[in-house]
Amino acid sequence: MENKNKKCLRTLLLLALFLGLLEDGKTALIAPNSQQIFKLQNQVILQELGRDSSSAETSYTFETDLKINSVWSGDEDQLLEVFISGSKVDASGKARSITRIPDRPFYISLVRGQPDKVIAHTSKDQSLLNLERGIASLLQLRLDASQEEELDVSGLCRVSYNVKSSTKVEKTKRDCSLWDLRVNYNPEEALGVTQQAQETVFYELSSEGTLLHAESQENHRLNLAAKPDVGSFVKSSLILQHVSQGSEEVKQLQLGSLDKAIQSLLEWYRVFELESDVDGMISAIKEQTLEDQLKASLTELQSADVGKSSLALAYVKLIPLARITRQEQFEDLLTEHAEVLPQLVDLLGAVQTFDAHNATFGFLYKESETTSEQLDLLEKYLQSLAVATHPDRKIVEHLFGLLEQESIKKHLKLRESVIQTVATLTRQSGLDVEDPLLKEVRSYLLQGLTSKEPTLYIRALQNLQDPATIEALLEHAQTGEAPNLSVAALQALKAFPLGSFNSSHRLQFESIFYQRKRRFDSSARTLALDIILSLRPTQEQLGNFLDYLASNDRQFEIKTYVLQKLRMLAEKCPRFRALFKSELVKRRHVNNYNVLGQKGLTTVLTRQLSQAPAFNETLLSTQEVYQGILKRGSVEFLLHAGRSQASSFKLGIYTAGLGSLVGDGDSGDGNDAIPADDEFSEDEAVTAGMEISVQGAQLRPLVFFSGQTELMGHVWGGSASDSTPAYQATTLSQDNEHYIILTSGATLHWRVLGARSVDLNGKVGFSLWNRNAQTEIQQNTGSAVLGHLAVGFTYAKLVQDFSITHEPKLSLNADLDFYSGIKLCMQLQRPEQLLKQTNVRSVFLQSVDRPYAKHVRSTLSHKTAGCTFALNQKNNEMCNLIFRDL
């Protein structure tokens, strides 16, 4: 305690001594009426994350001499005149003189001893002006508070000072506003980027309080959230070193105030704030057009390449150029390249500009004369656009206006896709709750709930995810007469952010699951359970779920679902696992084989698809079985980044009324003694379809058949026995771009674009004679991530370009035998995967007499062995029975 008090006393004495210097009138870092000579050095180093890299390979150093004259002073105010001379830049031992910096001085005004404005010539380039702001910011040293905010070249920053001695001070900067200037970003953390920044400034003063040395050291780490070892590390130092006192006489401006002194300069100069502006030249795209890049990529953009990483990589390379392309140019490309139209409309959806939107609709939509092929392409465009994270508001307004036109009402599928896209884009736009557009879209969708097709609007509300619609969805979930309405409403509610629900909502979900007021479809009950569990159940609620397992409810498939869901959560969360075990031990009537050995075929599981050094991806599979037949199933691919996760793709299958075709699941030789669940509806229509969600955007569902007549047509005609594409598209995944201003004034530009190309196809074989069926679903995915970083100023630049390509594939085979009892065997397989990573770091000396460039390349690859995923013991037993004679 005594040592601590001594340390505090020492700090206070140092601070008092330092403040004493300030009070004695020796506050100026540059002595009034004097000339001081300094040397300025700025070094910027770019390193690749994940491996050792020599700083000398990708770095530059800028050096110059500064002559600082104090040309006006009064009280604590001062005007400094700064001349830059003898400038040079060096990279990899190659030094180049800079002769283009004008010999005109710039000025720094100081108010109460602190830099306030930069007065510079209007013709100077942006990066040089930023450098001048950086020089001025190094003179910002204040000790009137231990922690506060300061405005300097990096914007508004939180700062704190640490007085080391009477002549040495350390300043720490945090959370500067210009360290994260976002242009585009993905709201899903797992699909975003992570940035860490810090800066420390060291000051050394003379015994009189004048500046001898100022040194800024800042670090910026930029990486993919889902793959932290991929990205860049930028280090920058800015050093101002006092050399000597100048010998020239400093002519003073004989004016009565600082404002008048500044005013006298404004014939040729302008006044600028300390806060920097982005130097747009750092992100300027080379002289290349979208048409040139498209022609160079045509071989990778063919329909046969869908599902391959080569197409995804070509796709993301086109995005930056496409975002600066005009409508007329898009129209020409659509006309000239008809052979790759499907890929072009995917691209234009990802562009998210009004020019791309107008070109697409102008080319494809002909109102009543629109052909079926054009309608398909328009739907494809809308599906790509629906994944957009920063759509132009005018696009949303145009699509919403289309819904009122009579011509589009005749194209039912297109109209539904427009509704789903409008809902998704409205959510992605992040509109204020009082925004008129949000209110109009919400009102339109809520009115649709009373139409003849309420499920369409319920799906749209799922995409909108507006908390103001929760009550309406809950009402449909609890009072809807048709089972599919309750299921759709709960499926929509499950998509909402967890923070949208309150305790009243939780009670209503419990009421649905436990059927306290009425009976509900089994899918509605399992969806309600999912929401309750995602809201983190209390100890009492968990105990109630365990007690339910031993209840007399005869819906054994739901009990199986509950048990598997609880076990899955226990595997993932240590806290929940401890709670689960403690509650289970308390219940002897539950903790026995009779209850825990549930009889159902329903399966809930999660499996690791890949992990570091590849991406951390898991598969979440839910197969809800009814009378031995798959009633509702889903396979969802989740990308993880720390504690956050994002759904990259979700495939759902739903069926109804198929039990009559396969007979009684309990008849037979007794191999499959599964008691039938309670009947919910005896006259259920025979239907089946597919639901697809891409990065949380629910697409228009695909209906396989509706009615027994249509089903039997497929059975006898064998129309589903050949592999048929169900979904083929390339969509944007990562879409992040932002700028950082370094203390030296150099601009850093970072852009990360990612795409996923998906080819989903399947086939079904059905034999009433042999009483069996076979289903095969194949998903081929090609993903690519392209990163670009550039940092520098007019005369030097560092660049890093990296790419990651990956082709994860998955196949699901299901064999159903209902010749004697019902036996269902599912096999989930993943073939070998290869992840490739390339990286190129470059240094450029430019706008000098002899330009210089150097490139450093590296590659990395990682193989993941193929495997067949274990599902559960019941599935293993079924597979052994079906294939015992093979």
Swiss-Prot record:
Source domain of life is Eukaryota
Keyword Endoplasmic reticulum on entry: yes
Q: Name its GO BP terms in alphabetical order.
A: dendrite morphogenesis; lipoprotein metabolic process; lumen formation, open tracheal system; synaptic target recognition
Q: Which residues form the Vitellogenin domain?
A: 30-653
Q: Which UniProt keywords apply?
A: Endoplasmic reticulum, Glycoprotein, Golgi apparatus, Signal, Transport
Keyword Transport assigned to the entry: answer is: yes
Q: Where is the signal peptide?
A: 1-27
Q: Which reaction does it catalyse?
A: a 1,2-diacyl-sn-glycero-3-phosphocholine(in) = a 1,2-diacyl-sn-glycero-3-phosphocholine(out); a 1,2-diacyl-sn-glycero-3-phosphoethanolamine(in) = a 1,2-diacyl-sn-glycero-3-phosphoethanolamine(out)
What cellular-component terms does GO give this entry?
A: basolateral plasma membrane; endomembrane system; endoplasmic reticulum; Golgi apparatus
Residues bearing attached sugar chains per UniProt: 358, 484, 502, 616
Q: Where in the cell is it found?
A: Endoplasmic reticulum; Golgi apparatus
InterPro entries documented for this protein: Lipid_transp_b-sht_shell, Lipovitellin_superhlx_dom, MTP_lip-bd, MTTP, Vitellinogen_b-sht_N, Vitellogenin_N
What the entry lists under Pfam families is as follows: MTP_lip_bd, Vitellogenin_N
GO terms for molecular function, please? lipid binding; phosphatidylcholine transporter activity; phospholipid transporter activity
> What's this protein's function?
Catalyzes the transport of phospholipids such as phosphatidylethanolamine (1,2-diacyl-sn-glycero-3-phosphoethanolamine) and phosphatidylcholine (1,2-diacyl-sn-glycero-3-phosphocholine) between membranes. Required for the assembly and secretion of plasma lipoproteins that contain apolipoprotein B.
Question: What is the recorded name of this protein?
Answer: Microsomal triacylglycerol transfer protein
Source species, please? Drosophila melanogaster (Fruit fly)
Lineage start: Eukaryota, Metazoa, Ecdysozoa, Arthropoda, Hexapoda
